[in-house]
Amino acid sequence: MNSWFRRAATQGRSCNLGIPQASDGPILRASRCVLAGTFLVLCLNAVPVGAQSLEEEVRAMRIELRRLQQEVGTLKEELRRRTAPAESAGSGSQGSQEKSAAAQEPAAAEVLPLLQAQVAEHAQVKVESNSRLPLKIFGTIVSNTFWNSGEANWLDVPNIVAPSPDAPVPKGSFSSTMRQSRFGVIVDGPAIGSLKSSGFLALDFFGGIPNFQTGQVMGIPRLLYAFARVEGEHTAVEIGQDQMILAPRNPTSLAAMAFPDLYRSGNLYLRVPQARVEQRIAAGDLDEFQLTGGILAPIAGDFAANSLVFVPPNLAGERSRRPAAQGRVAWRRRFSYGSEDRLEIGVSGHYGRERPVMGPRRSWAGAVDLDARAGRLGIGGEWFAGRNIDAFGGSLGQVAKSTGGFLEGRLAATRRLELNAGVGIDRLFDFDLFPAPLRQNRSVFANTIFQITPELAASFEYRWLMTTPARGEMRRNNHLNLALAFSF
């Protein structure tokens, strides 16, 4: 189909789709070419989804073809009617007609290449859903080759340093994985009055590995994002799984896509089902306030099973029988029109209830976040304090009280090369009232990201982690990661 289309498209104005030919002048030739291009577009759009759908598509094309043939007949009749007086006027009139035809010839020559280009572009990017809504497929193939000097809890994306193994087992690790690769779809939905609707879905392969001899190379798909969104000029409503409202900042990294850098070292993070409302309020030409509020699924409790299960268990969050609530107020300022230089400061909070076996308890947190850019320099970070926020990576993933945060610096050295570095810490407090196996976690990272082409990027990242247990020696790990990412 595509090769045929390319051959037909390169034939220029002599294209023929079985429509009666005539030599009545450039207007008719342009009409035939427009009809040919339209027929090609119709053929291209006829993507079958089944036998019945194919028959419907063919039937619709035949009806459309008959309609277009009737229009061509009408054009031919109109052309004959207009040229009849000119033919009886003599040679002088014939000369003016030739001039008119010469003037119309460039117009037809301009229309056809444009139509061919549009149809060719349509063939390259056209993806269609069952409901005929515009659909875009995207993805990133990510390769991570890594090395650890110590005992990392997650080899490819470490965030806690585990105790050293008993002798004679050596410390450290080396391997490579593709399980941070991801793909998804974006759907442009129908307009609802003045509102635009859209949908977003993304998955990766970080959902675990099967209990098999070579399970390391069999990453299980994991749902990342899945939400529907309706938005207007200043207001948006979203329902589905997205990053939580609390503490939305994350460090910049190509090697840590499944879980962000500094997770459990001052960076709170969770993707969770939710329903949220966003409101933007202008405060001058360059300033605006952003208000966000919503309710979230009550995610809490440690899933202790060592194997995959078919249904979610009824843990401390679900047993609370009520959603969690989060909100954020942010002020954003652009330094000038058309510039990416900006400053944004936000304050956010979380409140929820949990009901473990020992009785009900509260979960709360407050956070301040910052993001700024000036020229090639950028800075970002957040600070938080909270209780029972283990589901967000707070308190080192433990049921306790803690405070922490992170700070990141960014430098766009060139249009293709960027340098990033940051430091984070998570420290428990009220340790006597809320004891836990781990007391503190610190992390430092630095990376370079080089954009080889718009689709291909490479990154080298170094991470240093130090975990302090309640008893015993501090544990350290050096992590090196070479990441390659191809986006489509």
Residue ranges and their predicted role:
Residues 327, 332, 338-438:
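Detector for outer-membrane/organellar transmembrane beta-barrel domains
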